[in-house]
Design a protein with these regions (language model features):
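Conserved catalytic core of the tyrosine transesterase superfamily
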Residues: 1-296
Length: 296
């Protein structure tokens, strides 16, 4: 009951997405099961202390969960107990003195502009409805830096061809306008022409399946993974790699960090600044290519 109350709070008061709420629900259900297994079937948050939480962390590590996954679960649990404290259900947050496992934060993967241009200009896309749509999915993710959840949430009314911009809904239902260039506009018009001709049940959603239903995040992931597999030696193939590539390309070509932050829909510069590390790695590569830099 308490977990349900917390999830409703996230949904109706914090405007969290269904995807995020699902992640919280999964983490908290897992913790609740652990508590019941070790407390004779009783789940009483008021009886949970720091040592018990630490024992849960050990059990998660024993299950070979990555430090990143463990820390995400701890974050969910910490938010849950903050909620309980505000409601006066518990007097203290047992996670206040608990530290998660240390993690190495890797630099974002990104794809070189030349590799993506070769992919998009190549013949790896069919000329039917799905081929035209899939090409636009790749192009739009890379050209705008939007999230896949934002892409599938675009409605036809959100696209303004005259103003060359589209409205997307990001995390916590925050809306922002994203500009698009002439080339992307032409691809969008070509897609809608094929879609409206071949998909009878196409409704309010901009990106649809053959049956007219809205695309899912899973379908977008599979589209991107399949198409990016044509780029050799690519360590990671996901929609977020295209978002990383957009940000890295913008910064490498002189865009201001604040402007990239707004385009990505980040709430703070801290989230965007990770891409400056990637561009600095590029600068180091350029520097080391200099003859003088190669001398011992």
């Amino acid at each position: 009951m308490l977990i349900d109350d917390f999830l409703n709070y996230l949904r109706y008061e914090r405007n969290y997405s269904n995807y995020t709420i699902g992640a919280y629900s999964k983490d908290l259900d897992q913790f609740q099961r652990y508590v019941r297994e070790h407390r004779e079937g009783v789940f009483d948050p008021g009886e949970i202390d720091s040592d018990f939480v630490r024992s849960w962390i050990v059990s998660l590590m024993d299950e070979k969960l990555s430090p990143v996954s463990v820390n995400r679960k701890l974050s969910s649990l910490k938010s849950f107990f903050k909620f309980l404290m505000k409601r006066g259900i518990v007097s203290a947050n047992p996670l206040r003195l608990v530290s998660g496992p240390k993690t190495k934060k890797p630099l974002p993967y990104f794809i070189k502009d030349s590799e993506l241009e070769a992919l998009l200009d190549g013949d790896g896309f069919d000329e039917d409805f799905e081929g035209v749509r899939n090409r636009l999915v790749i192009e739009m993710l890379y050209d705008t830096g939007m999230r896949r959840s934002e892409l599938i949430g675009i409605r036809n009314v959100d696209v303004d061809y005259e103003a060359m911009q589209g409205k997307v809904t990001g995390k916590r239902n925050k809306q922002r306008l994203i500009p698009f260039a002439e080339g992307l506009k032409n691809l969008m018009l070509a897609y809608t022409e094929v879609r409206d001709r071949e998909v009878e049940a196409a409704g309010e959603w901009f990106f649809v399946r053959k049956n007219g239903n809205q695309l899912s995040t899973g379908i977008v992931y599979n589209i991107v993974k399949k198409q990016l597999s044509e780029i050799p030696m690519l360590a990671k193939r996901s929609p977020h790699v295209l978002r990383h590539s957009f940000a890295t390309s913008m910064l490498n070509n002189g865009a201001e960090l604040n402007a990239v932050k707004d385009l990505l829909g980040h709430s703070s510069l801290a989230s965007t600044s990770v891409y400056t590390h990637t561009t600095f790695e590029e600068l180091k590569k350029v520097y080391h290519a200099h003859p003088r830099a190669q001398k011992e």
